[in-house]
Amino acid sequence: MQSRNLWRILGLCLLSVGAWGQDEDFKASDDLTSISPEKRFKVSISGTEVVVTCPDVFGYDNIKWEKNDNLVEGASNRELSQKEFSEVDDSGYYACYADSIKEKSYLYLRARVCANCIEVNLMAVVTIIVADICLTLGLLLMVYYWSKTRKANAKPVMRGTGAGSRPRGQNKEKPPPVPNPDYEPIRKGQQDLYSGLNQRGI
């Protein structure tokens, strides 16, 4: 009974922690939604390639990029593409601005990339796990019912009462062994050579 109450208390604690974490997430998301969509950066990751798109405020004319306050050479589009992104070398503060507007928009970028990663959404993972559990349970039920029907159809094996076997009821009491004629017992009344033990004086 105490373990049941312990599980209830643990469940309530987990629910309260989850609700508290959701409040923090809502506060953070409120801060993000206060930024207008045209002032947000867009980041897309595919394999080892990372593409950062400058906000729509600056338009499309001659956009320059800076990384950690250093000008990025050869980047004049709204999209900054890095084919072989490295978390150690390429992470940092990125800024984009147009020549006509000197105001800069900053983004701190730190991304983990891998060459052989596959992006999987949550519904696909849940579907795979549920299908695997259902398939395993189905196989277990099939094996259980198959073994149950096989055991019910099997006939009990009876030992035949042949020359070398006895019925099970006679195994409880064994008859005394028959004396062997090669080894007769010593008779006290006879005086034969081997009828007694000779004791020699030393």
UniProtKB/Swiss-Prot annotation:
What the entry lists under CDD domains is as follows:
IgC1_CD3_epsilon (cd07692)
> Which residues does UniProt assign to the signal peptide?
1-21
Q: What is this protein called?
A: T-cell surface glycoprotein CD3 epsilon chain
Which positions fall inside the Ig-like domain?
37-107
Assembly state and interactors? The TCR-CD3 complex is composed of a CD3D/CD3E and a CD3G/CD3E heterodimers that preferentially associate with TCRalpha and TCRbeta, respectively, to form TCRalpha/CD3E/CD3G and TCRbeta/CD3G/CD3E trimers. In turn, the hexamer interacts with CD3Z homodimer to form the TCR-CD3 complex. Alternatively, TCRalpha and TCRbeta can be replaced by TCRgamma and TCRdelta. Interacts with CD6. Interacts (via Proline-rich sequence) with NCK1; the interaction is ligand dependent but independent of tyrosine kinase activation.
Instruction: State where composition is biased (Polar residues).
Output: 192-202
Q: Does the keyword Zinc apply?
A: no
Q: What is its main location?
A: membrane
Q: What is the lineage of its organism?
A: Eukaryota, Metazoa, Chordata, Craniata, Vertebrata
A biological-process GO annotation: positive thymic T cell selection
Q: Which GO molecular function terms does the record list?
A: transmembrane signaling receptor activity
Q: What does this protein do?
A: Part of the TCR-CD3 complex present on T-lymphocyte cell surface that plays an essential role in adaptive immune response. When antigen presenting cells (APCs) activate T-cell receptor (TCR), TCR-mediated signals are transmitted across the cell membrane by the CD3 chains CD3D, CD3E, CD3G and CD3Z. All CD3 chains contain immunoreceptor tyrosine-based activation motifs (ITAMs) in their cytoplasmic domain. Upon TCR engagement, these motifs become phosphorylated by Src family protein tyrosine kinases LCK and FYN, resulting in the activation of downstream signaling pathways.
Q: How is it modified after translation?
A: Phosphorylated on Tyr residues after T-cell receptor triggering by LCK in association with CD4/CD8.
Chain spans, region NUMB-binding region: 170-187
Look up and give the organism this protein is from. Answer: Canis lupus familiaris
Please give the PANTHER family that the UniProt record associates with this protein: T-CELL SURFACE GLYCOPROTEIN CD3 EPSILON CHAIN (PTHR10570:SF9), T-CELL SURFACE GLYCOPROTEIN CD3 GAMMA CHAIN / DELTA CHAIN (PTHR10570)
Region (Proline-rich sequence) residue ranges read 174-181
Q: Where is the ITAM domain?
A: 173-200
The subcellular location is: Cell membrane
